[in-house]
């Protein structure tokens, strides 16, 4: 029965109750149909397959497709992606199996991709190269450089690969390139100039440097920098919104005070805006990324991320050539921090990056000059330094710099100032390993010995000595190793010498140091240096280890002779089992078809030959084998071999890390890149663990529930911290004062109190008298003076300058009922603020004296429980009214009263009764209405979803750091320093000011009632409608209005 017939039988069984089976169906087939129908369901006449989802109780229903033509069309639609791209086999099957299902779906996807010509052409291009000549051509090696002149033609013929691989390579077809020029039918040719963009940027940059046509001045750290507003707004959304909000779009010149910004991080961004080249010190990459994120410069952030990806994917090596020192001591590493060396050259890397479309080059500058071999276009091969016999410490060798990323810009590594270096914790990134077993302390310079030994030994001889012949069996030592170990066989001939010698060879001393930023590269480097083993050898080795574990103690001589019966005749290895011995013999029988044309080594696989040829491309030859023999002799005298401790030092901050992976994670702090991003909200994180914790917050289900109370939590750690409240046991203790905390966040906040704060606040605001400890606090404070509000509520579109104010406001939308203090009546929308209020600021807890929270007015005797209400009331007595109406000039003591007053001009009534739909001007009037007529529907809190009237907390007249200059005002500015202020004056305002000036001459001043206030409003509205001033001038008694505050929300 085919798949279509079986699906039709299941469909008939589920839909036809009278005759569920076809006539003539056997009993065994009926049982199979009933069993299979348990996984299917029919909805709307269509058969669906129910598949169980992992970690979920529901089933995923997939439509079963019965028609072959429809199946072919669905596979084709899933294989083609957006833009005409072709998906892989796994992607096609994964997208298709989300909605549809039928038996053999994966096989049909495989067959379709095999018939796709574009996918097969892509597969041919990605086919690995197995021919040695093609590998040499790809790596840029010359065949004549490694061959001897007296070799015969028969030997040269052996270097080529088998004829089967040659025939496959001959079938490869070159991909032709087509250039298309689109020409309209009317004869209009559209072409673009690739040099136009750079030419325009060059002219703009020259105009900026020569102060031509500049219309904005940037004040940063007391210095002025000229620029163009159009260029700044095109590169940064921050400046664009600033110019639009301050009305500096159409004005001639504007001055922007950038207090809190640093020149070291801002000037590279300014240069990038005019040259599209980002040049900065690698140490300040984090500051540049943070400032670019603040200014909303997405291109700079992409460049910083691409730099980090280049270091991760391409394994970029920061190469620094200098003096290499070896240290041997019995003491700890901390004892050598004080030991210094003669002053040398300190290497500081400066990275220069161009745009993403620019050509990528990595230029290696050694002491300001290029190596001779690189200038000639050939890889440099330097002789290996020869370590002294007394020196036991070693430095990891420098790996060859890989090919740069094709999408990155120009990167150059340069050297700068001269500073002394430390013996162990050096700032240039060189990692030294110290043997603690040796009693003497030796400090040597490998660069001096390099000049002595480099002239005697050629790179080819060193490469031939260091690389043993792989044609021999792994059990037998090579010829080169025999010649090297003849002097040491008499003193110590144990099998442990070879392993210890290989460890010393892996940690051989080379000139230079490196920082490899890739996960797990240290282990891969050790595996690559070891002898490559095939799959058969690895299986045989596992069998040998298993046999040694299960090997029983010797009982008699007969059993021991039987165990040693399986012995290899070629390499001498002994196997306890016959199967392991047979698998081992297959290794010797298999032919080595791949031969290196440079050193005559033979390999069993093409991948092994490729890895071997890469070693020839290294610029520095490996350490000579003579250093290994001397180190073996020195170690042979001691009975115990000390273990080498390796540490990795950050060249930027000098921090010492135990693992290479820890250094890679540590470098994320210096680069400022957060590689892990949330797909829901877009928030980025440095660590993957932080992203997982953040993603759990988006999940609506709280899996972990407390057994003692009703609360549930998203993470297990939150549940454990909550359980500590019930049990009273806490695992977070302060090491300084011994205080315990239930949560780790509380401990981290507590530890900041023990940190000494600087005595002087180094960052001062130029607009007010406030000062701050950090620059980021000053930048955020400047948002209030500049009027920038980057934090916007997604519910009511209300904007804030401070993030904490925005967060508190967003919480008010999600909380149905606020947290209210039972004593003072203060309300909080955040539980943390409410708990802090109850714990610290109120009501005599923890031995405090009970505070009198009621504040009494000295003039009228009125009592207040909230401080802001008391201050507002005192402003009314003292006559401080910072909130002034721009329409009629009436001033108020608080913003709420001004909003209520402005709504009398506009006629807006935003507070609508949800029962009878009557609108009111404020929340107090609406609450009175609902209390009188709809007593059962009185809410706890009345808030507006979107408040159209937003005033500053300190008044409507606020000083701004952006000053608008006109052509007439520039002459006045040159005469002397004056404060500039912009005032918008209309015809209606002038008439109101004249009326106010006329009434101020009256000696008697009295307080207006609500009826008098409405007369003032009617006067302003009458002026707007064109009535005369004399009709209502008599109704005006005074303009000084004093109204008690009536809060909108209770």
From Swiss-Prot:
<feature type="zinc finger region" description="C2H2-type 6">
    <location>
        <begin position="732"/>
        <end position="754"/>
    </location>
</feature>
<dbReference type="InterPro" id="IPR041588">
    <property type="entry name" value="Integrase_H2C2"/>
</dbReference>
<feature type="zinc finger region" description="C2H2-type 12">
    <location>
        <begin position="911"/>
        <end position="934"/>
    </location>
</feature>
<keyword id="KW-0863">Zinc-finger</keyword>
<feature type="zinc finger region" description="C2H2-type 9">
    <location>
        <begin position="819"/>
        <end position="843"/>
    </location>
</feature>
<feature type="compositionally biased region" description="Low complexity">
    <location>
        <begin position="623"/>
        <end position="638"/>
    </location>
</feature>
<comment type="function">
    <text>May be involved in transcriptional regulation.</text>
</comment>
<feature type="region of interest" description="Disordered">
    <location>
        <begin position="543"/>
        <end position="563"/>
    </location>
</feature>
<keyword id="KW-0479">Metal-binding</keyword>
<feature type="compositionally biased region" description="Low complexity">
    <location>
        <begin position="157"/>
        <end position="168"/>
    </location>
</feature>
<feature type="domain" description="BTB">
    <location>
        <begin position="214"/>
        <end position="282"/>
    </location>
</feature>
<keyword id="KW-0539">Nucleus</keyword>
<keyword id="KW-0805">Transcription regulation</keyword>
<dbReference type="GO" id="GO:0005730">
    <property type="term" value="C:nucleolus"/>
</dbReference>
<dbReference type="Pfam" id="PF17921">
    <property type="entry name" value="Integrase_H2C2"/>
</dbReference>
<dbReference type="GO" id="GO:0005634">
    <property type="term" value="C:nucleus"/>
</dbReference>
<feature type="zinc finger region" description="C2H2-type 10">
    <location>
        <begin position="855"/>
        <end position="877"/>
    </location>
</feature>
<protein>
    <recommendedName>
        <fullName>Zinc finger and BTB domain-containing protein 11</fullName>
    </recommendedName>
</protein>
<dbReference type="InterPro" id="IPR013087">
    <property type="entry name" value="Znf_C2H2_type"/>
</dbReference>
<feature type="compositionally biased region" description="Basic and acidic residues">
    <location>
        <begin position="553"/>
        <end position="563"/>
    </location>
</feature>
<feature type="compositionally biased region" description="Basic and acidic residues">
    <location>
        <begin position="478"/>
        <end position="501"/>
    </location>
</feature>
<feature type="zinc finger region" description="C2H2-type 11">
    <location>
        <begin position="883"/>
        <end position="905"/>
    </location>
</feature>
<feature type="zinc finger region" description="C2H2-type 7">
    <location>
        <begin position="763"/>
        <end position="785"/>
    </location>
</feature>
<dbReference type="Pfam" id="PF00651">
    <property type="entry name" value="BTB"/>
</dbReference>
<keyword id="KW-0238">DNA-binding</keyword>
<keyword id="KW-0677">Repeat</keyword>
<dbReference type="InterPro" id="IPR011333">
    <property type="entry name" value="SKP1/BTB/POZ_sf"/>
</dbReference>
<dbReference type="InterPro" id="IPR036236">
    <property type="entry name" value="Znf_C2H2_sf"/>
</dbReference>
<feature type="region of interest" description="Disordered">
    <location>
        <begin position="373"/>
        <end position="514"/>
    </location>
</feature>
<feature type="zinc finger region" description="C2H2-type 4">
    <location>
        <begin position="676"/>
        <end position="698"/>
    </location>
</feature>
<dbReference type="GO" id="GO:0005654">
    <property type="term" value="C:nucleoplasm"/>
</dbReference>
<dbReference type="GO" id="GO:0008270">
    <property type="term" value="F:zinc ion binding"/>
</dbReference>
<feature type="zinc finger region" description="C2H2-type 8">
    <location>
        <begin position="791"/>
        <end position="813"/>
    </location>
</feature>
<feature type="zinc finger region" description="C2H2-type 3">
    <location>
        <begin position="648"/>
        <end position="670"/>
    </location>
</feature>
<feature type="region of interest" description="Disordered">
    <location>
        <begin position="617"/>
        <end position="641"/>
    </location>
</feature>
<feature type="region of interest" description="Disordered">
    <location>
        <begin position="143"/>
        <end position="173"/>
    </location>
</feature>
<feature type="zinc finger region" description="C2H2-type 1">
    <location>
        <begin position="566"/>
        <end position="588"/>
    </location>
</feature>
<feature type="compositionally biased region" description="Low complexity">
    <location>
        <begin position="378"/>
        <end position="399"/>
    </location>
</feature>
<keyword id="KW-0804">Transcription</keyword>
<dbReference type="GO" id="GO:0003677">
    <property type="term" value="F:DNA binding"/>
</dbReference>
<dbReference type="InterPro" id="IPR048060">
    <property type="entry name" value="ZBTB11_BTB_POZ"/>
</dbReference>
<feature type="zinc finger region" description="C2H2-type 5">
    <location>
        <begin position="704"/>
        <end position="726"/>
    </location>
</feature>
């Amino acid at each position: 029965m085919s798949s279509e017939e079986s699906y039709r039988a299941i469909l008939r069984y589920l839909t036809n109750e009278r005759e569920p089976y076809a006539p003539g169906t056997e009993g065994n087939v009926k049982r199979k149909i009933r069993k299979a129908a348990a996984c299917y369901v029919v909805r709307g006449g269509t058969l669906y397959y129910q598949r169980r989802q992992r970690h979920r109780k529901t089933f995923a229903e997939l439509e079963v497709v019965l028609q072959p033509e429809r199946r072919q069309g669905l596979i084709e639609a899933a294989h083609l992606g957006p833009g005409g791209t072709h998906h892989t086999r796994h992607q096609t099957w994964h997208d298709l199996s989300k909605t549809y299902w039928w038996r053999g779906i994966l096989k049909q996807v495989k067959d379709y991709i095999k018939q796709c010509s574009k996918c097969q052409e892509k597969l041919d291009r990605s086919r690995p190269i197995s021919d040695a000549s093609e590998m040499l051509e790809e790596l840029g090696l010359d065949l004549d450089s490694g061959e001897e002149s007296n070799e015969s033609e028969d030997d040269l013929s052996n270097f080529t690969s088998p004829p089967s691989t040659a025939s496959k390579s001959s079938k490869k077809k070159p991909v032709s390139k087509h250039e298309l020029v689109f020409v309209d039918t009317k004869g209009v040719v559209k072409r673009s100039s690739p040099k136009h963009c750079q030419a325009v940027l060059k002219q703009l940059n020259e105009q900026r440097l020569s102060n031509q046509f500049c219309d904005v001045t940037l004040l940063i750290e007391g210095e002025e920098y000229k620029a163009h507003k159009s260029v700044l707004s095109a590169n940064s959304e921050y400046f664009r919104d600033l110019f639009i909000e301050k009305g500096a779009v159409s004005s001639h010149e504007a001055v922007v005070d950038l207090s809190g910004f640093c020149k070291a991080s801002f000037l590279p961004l300014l240069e990038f805006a005019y040259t599209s080249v980002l040049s900065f010190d690698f140490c300040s990459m984090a500051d540049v990324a943070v400032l670019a994120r603040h200014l909303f410069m997405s291109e700079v952030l992409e460049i910083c991320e691409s730099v980090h990806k280049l270091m991760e994917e391409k394994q970029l090596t920061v190469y620094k050539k200098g003096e290499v020192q070896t240290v041997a001591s019995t003491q700890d590493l901390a004892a050598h921090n004080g030991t210094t060396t003669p002053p040398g050259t300190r290497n500081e890397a400066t990275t220069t990056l161009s745009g993403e479309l620019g050509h990528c080059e990595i230029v290696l500058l050694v002491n300001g000059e290029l190596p001779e071999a690189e200038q000639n276009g050939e890889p440099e091969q330097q002789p290996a330094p020869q370590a002294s016999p007394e020196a036991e410490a070693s430095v990891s060798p420098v790996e060859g710099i890989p090919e740069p990323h094709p999408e990155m810009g120009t990167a150059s590594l340069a050297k700068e100032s001269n500073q002394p270096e430390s013996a162990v914790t050096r700032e240039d990134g060189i990692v030294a390993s110290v043997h603690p077993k040796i009693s003497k302390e030796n400090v040597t310079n490998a660069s001096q010995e390099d000049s002595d030994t480099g002239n005697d030994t050629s790179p080819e001889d060193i490469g031939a000595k260091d690389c043993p012949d792989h044609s021999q069996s792994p059990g037998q030592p090579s010829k080169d190793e025999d010649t090297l170990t003849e002097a040491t066989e008499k003193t110590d001939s144990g099998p442990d010498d070879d392993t210890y010698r290989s460890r010393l060879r892996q940690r051989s001393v080379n000139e230079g140091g490196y920082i490899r930023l890739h996960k797990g590269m240290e282990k891969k480097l050790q595996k690559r240096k070891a002898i490559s083993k095939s799959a058969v050898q690895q299986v045989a080795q596992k069998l040998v280890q298993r046999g040694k574990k299960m090997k029983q103690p010797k009982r008699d001589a007969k059993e021991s002779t039987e165990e040693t019966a399986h012995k290899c005749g070629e390499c001498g290895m002994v196997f306890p089992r016959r199967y392991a011995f047979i698998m081992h013999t297959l290794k010797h029988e298999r032919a080595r078809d791949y031969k290196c044309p440079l050193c005559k080594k033979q390999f069993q696989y093409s991948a092994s030959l490729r890895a071997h040829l890469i070693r020839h491309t290294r610029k520095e030859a490996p350490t000579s084998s003579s250093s290994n023999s001397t180190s073996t002799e020195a170690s042979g005298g001691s009975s115990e071999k000390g273990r080498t401790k390796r540490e990795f030092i950050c060249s930027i901050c000098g921090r010492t890390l135990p693992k290479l992976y820890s250094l890679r994670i540590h470098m994320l702090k210096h680069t400022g890149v957060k590689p892990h991003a949330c797909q829901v909200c877009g928030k980025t994180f440095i660590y993957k663990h932080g992203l997982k914790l953040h993603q759990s917050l988006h999940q609506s289900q709280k899996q972990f529930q407390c057994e003692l109370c009703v609360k549930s939590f998203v993470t297990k750690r939150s549940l454990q911290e909550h359980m500590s409240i019930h049990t009273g046991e806490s695992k977070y203790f302060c090491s300084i004062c011994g205080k315990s905390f239930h949560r780790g966040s509380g401990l981290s906040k507590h530890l900041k109190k023990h940190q000494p704060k600087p005595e002087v606040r180094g960052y001062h605001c130029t607009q007010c008298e406030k000062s701050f400890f950090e620059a980021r606090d000053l930048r955020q404070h400047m948002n209030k003076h500049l009027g920038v509000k980057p934090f916007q509520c997604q519910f009511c579109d209300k904007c804030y300058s401070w993030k904490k104010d925005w967060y508190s406001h967003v919480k008010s939308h999600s909380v149905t009922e606020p947290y209210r203090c039972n004593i003072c009546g203060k309300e909080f929308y955040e539980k943390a603020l409410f708990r802090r209020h109850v714990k610290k600021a109120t009501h005599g807890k923890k031995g405090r004296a009970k505070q009198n929270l009621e504040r009494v007015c000295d003039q009228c005797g009125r009592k207040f429980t909230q401080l802001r209400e008391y201050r507002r009331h005192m402003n009314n007595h003292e006559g401080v009214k910072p909130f002034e109406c721009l329409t009629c000039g009436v001033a108020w003591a608080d913003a709420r009263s001004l909003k209520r007053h402005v709504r009398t001009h506009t006629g807006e009534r935003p507070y609508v009764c949800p029962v009878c739909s009557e609108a009111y001007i404020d929340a107090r009037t609406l609450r009175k209405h609902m209390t009188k007529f709809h007593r059962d529907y009185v809410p706890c809190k009345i808030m507006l979803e979107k408040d159209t009237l937003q005033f500053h907390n300190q008044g409507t007249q606020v000083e701004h750091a952006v000053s608008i200059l006109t052509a007439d005002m520039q002459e006045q500015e040159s005469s002397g320093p004056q404060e500039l202020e912009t005032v918008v004056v209309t015809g209606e305002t002038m008439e109101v000011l004249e009326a106010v000036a006329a009434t101020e001459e009256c000696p008697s001043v009295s307080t207006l009632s609500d009826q008098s206030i409405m007369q003032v409003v009617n006067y302003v509205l009458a002026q707007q409608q064109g009535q005369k001033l004399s009709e209502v001038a008599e109704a005006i008694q005074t303009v000084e209005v004093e109204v008690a505050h009536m809060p909108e929300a209770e």
